[in-house]
């Protein structure tokens, strides 16, 4: 009989929003498309708020409320960057519902976003979801084209 006491669960990052899944290489911003911040995927949101894609701890909330960093329970660090050039909105269009240091669970609401305002006042409402410490591990990105918040696994880690 083999015991799996020490076998770690594989990381599963679920979609934080509903929308179209886009390869990171197609995000119209070189910081993301050239993977300067790490491996990942992007979602063009169709509706709704932004929810936690993993169980973990909030480690960063941008002062302009457009980005949230989460450390998953396995140590993987995930950045949700809501929109492109949204730092210039100075927090307008965003209401963050968590604080740095909060323990969060998959599916917990972390941000309300005014998609109409963001669409009119920023370059894009696309959400890059980046593993900022991806050099340490290997990840498998989904081949799905559409994301269902809380259900579609978009990134799997080893």
Model-predicted regions and their roles:
Residues 1-158:
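Contiguous, well-folded functional domains in the mature portion of proteins
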């Amino acid at each position: 009989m083999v015991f799996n006491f020490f076998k770690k669960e594989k990381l599963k990052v679920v979609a934080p929003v509903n929308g179209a899944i886009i390869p990171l290489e197609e995000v119209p911003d070189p910081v993301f498309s050239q993977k300067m911040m790490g491996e990942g995927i992007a979602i063009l949101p169709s509706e709704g708020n932004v929810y936690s894609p993993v169980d973990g701890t909030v480690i960063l909330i941008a002062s302009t409320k457009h980005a949230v960093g989460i450390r998953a329970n396995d140590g993987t660090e995930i950045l949700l960057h809501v929109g492109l050039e949204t730092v210039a909105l100075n927090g307008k269009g965003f209401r963050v519902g968590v604080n740095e240091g909060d323990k969060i669970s998959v599916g917990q609401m972390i941000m309300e976003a005014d998609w109409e305002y963001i669409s009119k006042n920023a370059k894009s409402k696309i959400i890059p979801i980046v593993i900022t410490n991806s050099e340490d591990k290997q990840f498998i990105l989904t081949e799905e084209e559409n994301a269902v918040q809380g259900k579609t696994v978009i990134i799997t880690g080893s």
